[in-house]
């Protein structure tokens, strides 16, 4: 698996590799009890879940790394758990409204000893007193709704990183028709291609005014 990541300039340390393998094992086992993912093949897991989660942070030019992240609708831990594993210096808040999935995230947190992770079992719009540098979301809801949820949680000039499929332009067009556009400084798209013809991805970066 290391060769896949090396091609993108990403180095997996032995410790990180072990934790990623352990994460995969936990996910596959718990997936038998609750619906976490349809992806069970190990190569697909590493490409469509792990690589997909971290690529925006390695392939976006002039990116200033955040000190804190809030992940909306973390589900099975993508991208939240993955970002916490790759960047242990960043504090990561995982929000998940479904109890069974939140308990899964707690299990992963404790098993992998992720001291930089906090799991909150609630809807993101109900969470109070949490301000972060970056809000992320992957396969949760439309862009306009995500921005509406994210803005109150961001520090001044904080950013949003929303993982989308290649056909995201209509969502951006709809977002620009709303009043929320007046609250953001800029929108940038980072496009990347997953190996083994596993798809095109777009990360929508949005900066708060």
Regions found by a protein language model. Name each.
Residues 1-66, 70, 100-117:
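Class I SAM-dependent transferase core
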Residues 27, 83, 164, 206:
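Residue-level signal for inorganic ion chemistry
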Residues 54-137, 147:
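Conserved SAM/SAH cofactor-binding pocket of Class I
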Residues 87, 154-156:
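Helix-to-beta-strand junctions that scaffold the AdoMet/dcAdoMet cofactor pocket
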Residues 91, 116-118, 159, 183-188:
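Conserved beta-strand segments of alpha/beta enzyme cores
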Residues 133-147, 151-152, 166:
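A short SAM/SAH-binding and catalytic strip from SAM-dependent methyltransferases
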Residues 157-167:
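Conserved beta-strand signature within the Rossmann-like core of class I S-adenosyl-L-methionine
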Residues 167-209:
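Active-site capping/gating segments
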């Amino acid at each position: 698996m290391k060769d896949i990541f090396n091609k993108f300039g990403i180095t997996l340390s032995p410790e990180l590799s072990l934790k990623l393998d352990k994460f995969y094992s936990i996910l596959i086992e718990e997936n038998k009890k609750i619906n976490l993912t349809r992806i069970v093949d190990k190569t697909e897991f590493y490409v469509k879940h792990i690589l997909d989660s971290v690529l925006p942070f390695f392939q976006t030019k002039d990116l200033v790394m955040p000190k804190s992240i809030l992940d909306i609708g973390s589900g099975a831990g993508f991208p939240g758990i993955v970002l916490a594993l790759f960047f242990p210096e960043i504090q990561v808040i995982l929000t998940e409204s479904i109890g069974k999935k939140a308990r899964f995230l707690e299990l992963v947190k404790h098993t992998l000893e992720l001291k930089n992770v906090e799991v909150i079992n609630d809807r993101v719009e109900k969470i109070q007193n949490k301000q972060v540098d970056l809000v992320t979301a992957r396969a949760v809801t439309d862009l306009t709704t995500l921005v509406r949820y994210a803005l109150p949680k961001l520090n001044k000039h904080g950013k949003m990183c929303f993982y989308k499929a290649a056909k995201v332009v209509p969502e951006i067009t709809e977002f620009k028709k709303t009043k929320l556009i007046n609250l953001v400084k800029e929108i940038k798209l980072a496009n990347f291609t997953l190996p083994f013809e596993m798809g095109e991805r777009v990360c929508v970066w949005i900066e708060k005014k």
